[in-house]
Amino acid sequence: MMQPSIKPADEHSAGDIIARIGSLTHMLRDSLRELGLVQAIAEAAEAIPDARDRLYYVVQMTAQAAERALNSVEASQPHQDQMEKSAKALTQRWDDWFADPIDLADARELVTDTRQFLADVPAHTSFTNAQLLEIMMAQDFQDLTGQVIKRMMDVIQEIERQLLMVLLENIPEQESRPKRENQSLLNGPQVDTSKAGVVASQDQVDDLLDSLGF
């Protein structure tokens, strides 16, 4: 004896679920477009179990890189200031000497100070170069965070695809078909919602959502 098919107790609530899924899908589409990801991303290779932790990881790595760069700049600044101050002072003293040559003893002192400055320059520049290297190395976070963001975007793309499939499989036929037929003359060929996996382009996704009223 055949069992009667079980129908949803509240058809309106089922419709609300479909509407909410459609709205969420539309939001994801708009977000992808705003990020410049208009072209379809490759299908998800693997899911990220906890997107919140991944985002926190990206924020953490970015903050650490910024801190390393700022620390290096702050460490280098005194060395640059010292060289600038000493160079300006020596330049002024040499200008004064050429304008009015001084005694031999004072000239020797000027030469000695100049030689000391030249001897100190390599130490300052070496320290500064090390800090510049640290700033450059701090940028390696971009490779790691870029991979994480790419995986998250893949997952978002997969979620969008799955939500579209839910709409295709569950939208009431009597509600979706008239809308597609009414708009077919304006928008051209529409997506065949009777087949799975037919969403082939971004324009088709938009047309599908429009035809379903989202």
Swiss-Prot record:
GO terms for biological process: archaeal or bacterial-type flagellum-dependent cell motility; chemotaxis; regulation of chemotaxis. Disulfide bonds: none annotated. GO terms for cellular component: bacterial-type flagellum; cytoplasm. Residues 183-193 have a biased composition (Polar residues). Keywords: Chemotaxis, Cytoplasm, Flagellar rotation, Hydrolase, Protein phosphatase. Its EC number is 3.1.3.-. It is found in: Cytoplasm. The record marks Q147 as: Enhances dephosphorylation of CheY-P. The keyword Protein biosynthesis does not apply. It is an enzyme of class 3 (hydrolase). It comes from the Bacteria. One of its GO terms (molecular function) is phosphoprotein phosphatase activity. Belongs to the CheZ family. PANTHER family: PROTEIN PHOSPHATASE CHEZ. Plays an important role in bacterial chemotaxis signal transduction pathway by accelerating the dephosphorylation of phosphorylated CheY (CheY-P). This is Protein phosphatase CheZ. It comes from Shigella flexneri.
